[in-house]
C-alpha cells in the first residue's frame, strides 16, 4: 500500500505482459545490450575488449544486483550509470568496457523497442488463441438462427456461427496488422 498501483495493471494485465514491462526485464535487457555492444566492438577491431571480458559479462547477465544499483543511483542520480557501475562491481575485469562508446539512449531506446516487440508477440499469440476459440464457437453455433443487422437495424436472417466468422475476419485482419508492425520494428 506504499506505492502507486494502476487498476488497469492489477485487473487486466497478464503475468506475461507484466513481466515484459517490469524493471527486471528492462535491466536484464540492458545487460544483454551491453554484451552485444562489446561483441560488436570487438568484432569491428576494438582490441581492448577480450573474450574473457565478454564471458564475464555473460556470467552476470541475469544476476542483477538491484541493491547495489539502487545505492549508485542515489549517488549518481542516473539510472543507466548506476547499472553500469553495479554491473562493473560484479564483472570487475569487464568494468571498463561496459557501455563503452554508447549513450544512455542506446540501452533505453533499444530496450523500449524490444519490450514493445515482445508485447506485440504476446498479443499476437493471444489473438491466435482467440481465433481458434472463435472457430470452435462458430462451428458450435453454425445452425442457430439470429437476425443480422445493418445500419443499426434488424435485417435478414443469419446464424450466430456466420456472425462469428465475421468477427474472425476482423481478428485475422488484426493479426496481419500486427505482423506488419512486427516486421517493421
Regions found by a protein language model. Give the residues of each.
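A helix-coil-helix interface module used to build multimeric assemblies
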Residues: 1-185
Amino acid at each position: 500500500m506504499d506505492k502507486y498501483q494502476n487498476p488497469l495493471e492489477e485487473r487486466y494485465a497478464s503475468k506475461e505482459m507484466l513481466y515484459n514491462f517490469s524493471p527486471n526485464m528492462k535491466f536484464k535487457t540492458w545487460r544483454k545490450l551491453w554484451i552485444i555492444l562489446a561483441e560488436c566492438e570487438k568484432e569491428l577491431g576494438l582490441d581492448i575488449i577480450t573474450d574473457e571480458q565478454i564471458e564475464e559479462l555473460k556470467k552476470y547477465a541475469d544476476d542483477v544486483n538491484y541493491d547495489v544499483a539502487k545505492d549508485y543511483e542515489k549517488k549518481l542520480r542516473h539510472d543507466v550509470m548506476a547499472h553500469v557501475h553495479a554491473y562493473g562491481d560484479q564483472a570487475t575485469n569487464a568494468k571498463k568496457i561496459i557501455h563503452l562508446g554508447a549513450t544512455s539512449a542506446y540501452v533505453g531506446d533499444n530496450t523500449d523497442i524490444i519490450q514493445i516487440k515482445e508485447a506485440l508477440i504476446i498479443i499476437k499469440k493471444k489473438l491466435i488463441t482467440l481465433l481458434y476459440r472463435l472457430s470452435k464457437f462458430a462451428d458450435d453455433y453454425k445452425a442457430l438462427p439470429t437476425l443480422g443487422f445493418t445500419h443499426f437495424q434488424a435485417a435478414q436472417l443469419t446464424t450466430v456461427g456466420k456472425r462469428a466468422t465475421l468477427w474472425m475476419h476482423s481478428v485475422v485482419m488484426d493479426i496481419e496488422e500486427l505482423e506488419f508492425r512486427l516486421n517493421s520494428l
